[in-house]
């Protein structure tokens, strides 16, 4: 019992001292002065980099990215997969992009000229052994057309770019040559029975 009275007696002065402190803390000495709060937000530290090779879930080679400092310092830089962006590097990157664009334009122009040449050439003649009526033995394949183009025009063409309808009869057909993603040449193919 003595211990319970001791604890009850000792807790009341403590409560009074806390209450007294709370009153003094909540009151401002001068009500006309402003109350200022300073808060600092942690900033994200990033670096601008250029990737030297393709990295899964990060980006492709030559891409300009903002990455965390730790990721660059601990992974990208030691493994040689990225470099920091400097004015000199940006200038080199711009020159390289211009060179690549010029090369793309040159390839597109060559493909357009080649398409015009194929379309104005006329028809490629394919001879096959004939059967009943207009039927032929076998069919004309993309490889046959590639061989004929090589023989008549001395031009190498990959058979994967040739889109040829199924040819099992004599007559005139139109084949497509996909010379560039933006350029397709249409060529006529005359199938003649021997």
Curated annotation (Swiss-Prot):
GO MF terms on file?
Answer: rRNA binding; structural constituent of ribosome
Span of the secretion signal?
Answer: none
For this protein, the record's InterPro entries field holds:
Ribosomal_bL9, Ribosomal_bL9/RNase_H1_N, Ribosomal_bL9_bac/chp, Ribosomal_bL9_C, Ribosomal_bL9_C_sf, Ribosomal_bL9_N, Ribosomal_bL9_N_sf
Q: Where is the transit peptide?
A: 1-39
Q: Kindly list the GO CC terms recorded for this protein.
A: chloroplast; ribonucleoprotein complex; ribosome
**PROSITE patterns according to UniProt:** RIBOSOMAL_L9
One Gene Ontology term of the biological-process aspect is: translation
| Gene3D superfamilies registered for this protein in UniProt | Ribosomal protein L9, C-terminal domain (3.10.430.100), Ribosomal protein L9, N-terminal domain (3.40.5.10)
What are the record keywords, sorted? Chloroplast, Plastid, Ribonucleoprotein, Ribosomal protein, RNA-binding, rRNA-binding, Transit peptide
User: In the UniProt record, does the keyword Cell division occur?
Assistant: no
What is the annotated localization of this protein? Plastid, Chloroplast
Q: Which family does the similarity line name?
A: Belongs to the bacterial ribosomal protein bL9 family.
Q: What is the recorded function of this protein according to its Swiss-Prot or TrEMBL entry? A: Binds to the 23S rRNA.
Assembly: Part of the 50S ribosomal subunit.
Which PANTHER family does this UniProt record tie to the protein? Answer: 50S RIBOSOMAL PROTEIN L9
User: What is the protein named?
Assistant: Large ribosomal subunit protein bL9c
């Amino acid at each position: 019992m003595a211990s319970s009275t001791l604890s009850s007696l000792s807790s009341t002065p403590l409560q009074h001292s806390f209450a007294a402190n709370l009153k003094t803390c909540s009151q401002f000495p001068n009500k006309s002065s402003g109350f200022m709060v300073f808060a600092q937000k942690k900033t994200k530290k990033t670096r601008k980099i250029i990737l030297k090779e393709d990295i899964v879930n990060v980006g492709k080679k030559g891409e300009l990215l903002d990455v965390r400092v730790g990721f660059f310092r601990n992974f990208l830089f030691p493994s040689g997969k990225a470099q920091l962006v400097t004015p000199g590097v940006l200038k080199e990157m711009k020159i390289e992009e211009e060179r690549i664009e010029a090369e793309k334009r040159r390839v597109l122009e060559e493909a357009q000229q080649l398409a015009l040449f194929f379309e104005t050439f006329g028809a490629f003649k394919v001879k096959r052994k004939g059967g009943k009526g207009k039927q032929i033995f076998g069919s004309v394949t993309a490889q046959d057309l590639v061989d004929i183009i090589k023989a008549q025009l001395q031009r190498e063409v990959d058979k994967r770019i040739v889109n040829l309808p199924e040819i099992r009869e004599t007559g005139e057909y139109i084949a497509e040559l996909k010379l560039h993603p933006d350029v397709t040449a249409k060529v006529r193919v005359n199938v003649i029975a021997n």
